[in-house]
Amino acid sequence: MQIKRITEANLPTPWTNFLMIGFEEIKTKCNHIALLHGNMSKNTSILTRIHSECLTGDALFSLRCDCGFQLQSALSHIANEKCGILIYHRQEGRNIGLINKIKAYSLQDKGIDTVDANYHLGFEADERDFTVCVEILNLLQIKSIRLLTNNPNKVNVLTSAGILITERVPLIVGSNPSNTKYLYTKAKKMGHLLNNK
């Protein structure tokens, strides 16, 4: 086990009230949170979003990506369903870190796409490790989910780790002139499913 449950508190939001649970990685001391809403024991397949940290999109309202739009849409979906979980996965910039993400943005300003910018900086296209997310689901005794994602890799990783995914729920929001190339690259080079299927 790489992670432990530390604390919890209520979190009122514009969408609904959530129970916010704080987790800590044992080796790195990195913190992650899970937002829970509704009665998990009464639902056989929990609507779930694994949302990787994006300071620029989530907190600064950047139009360069669709992250902030996805975060808000996921919280709204969970509120409407009256049950669900959002794991806020603290791996900024597909786990290259904030400063390297800004460096990648600088390269994108020069015409390099989001994947090649990572390669240029010495990283893989996606450096994220979803092991912690699997452990959070296991600690919360959630074994069957409906996953809010456009990323087939998340589906594969969670399925391989023993999480039953009964449905992939598309989360296609936030397209705008500033992120058209970014979204095209995610679909073409990273296999993201952006056609609502």
UniProtKB/Swiss-Prot annotation:
The keyword Transferase appears for this protein: no
Origin: domain of life: Bacteria
Keyword entries, A-Z: GTP-binding, Hydrolase, Metal-binding, Nucleotide-binding, Riboflavin biosynthesis, Zinc
Cofactor binding note of this UniProt entry: Binds 1 zinc ion per subunit.
A GO molecular-function descriptor: zinc ion binding
Catalytic activity: GTP + 4 H2O = 2,5-diamino-6-hydroxy-4-(5-phosphoribosylamino)-pyrimidine + formate + 2 phosphate + 3 H(+)
Binding annotation for Zn(2+): C54, C65, C67
Named cofactor requirement(s): Zn(2+)
Binding site for GTP: R49, I50, H51, S52, E53, Q70, E92, G93, R94, T114, T149, K154
Coiled-coil residue spans: none
One GO CC term, this protein: cytosol
Record EC number: 3.5.4.25
Pathway: Cofactor biosynthesis; riboflavin biosynthesis; 5-amino-6-(D-ribitylamino)uracil from GTP: step 1/4
CDD domains in UniProt: GTP_cyclohydro2
Active site positions: D126, R128
GO biological process: riboflavin biosynthetic process
NCBIfam families the record matches: PRK00393.1, ribA
Entry function: Catalyzes the conversion of GTP to 2,5-diamino-6-ribosylamino-4(3H)-pyrimidinone 5'-phosphate (DARP), formate and pyrophosphate.
Family (UniProt): Belongs to the GTP cyclohydrolase II family.
Subunit structure and binding partners: Homodimer.
Protein name: GTP cyclohydrolase-2
Organism of origin: Wigglesworthia glossinidia brevipalpis
Gene label: ribA
